[in-house]
């Protein structure tokens, strides 16, 4: 692993610290989640798939920085099920282990994601722009969790796109509401302080 940001460096350092504290009464297991997607009680429209879908619906345009940058994605239901699977697994399969949570077939380039969304929202224009400072690109293997814990993610980005579009079309979800963006909520709290 080669962390590219302070955030990822902190995560790796934390994982190493936790794993190094393993003993007979503490047997940690690290789960590394792919980028979450899908409907959830606390929706996030500041995550890649939902952000692209929101922009397609409201702006009729998806702007892509780094179109060939890869991202792994996982449905929130699969992430939850991976946690349950891990908790129920025998300690010899999880103690001191690190598992990536997702499905290898759910690695996409940003351009691939935009094109799939365009299938659902055909009026969407895709605009490729110069890269921002975020240069992260990574494809992830999820073979270890599949092999060791027999865990397989079941839901795809297409499932999420259909579910989210349905909820928005019914008027039950406003993708621009600040409650669906961590940065917007943080900004509101700072201003209130």
Report residues per predicted region.
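Catalytic helix-loop patch of NAD(P)-dependent Rossmann-fold dehydrogenases
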Residues: 1-30, 35-36, 41
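Oxidoreductase cofactor-interface core, primarily capturing Rossmann-like NAD(P)-dependent enzymes
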Residues: 26-31, 38-63, 73-74
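C-terminal substrate-binding subdomain of Rossmann-fold SDR/epimerase-dehydratase oxidoreductases
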Residues: 60, 64-193
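Conserved active-site helix of classical SDR/Rossmann-fold NAD(P)-dependent CH-OH oxidoreductases
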Residues: 12-19, 50-53, 81
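A generic fold-level signal
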Residues: 1, 25, 44-47, 93, ...
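Short amphipathic helix/loop within the catalytic HATPase_c
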Residues: 21, 52, 56, 117-121
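Short alpha-helix boundary/capping motifs
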Residues: 8-11, 46, 107, 135-136
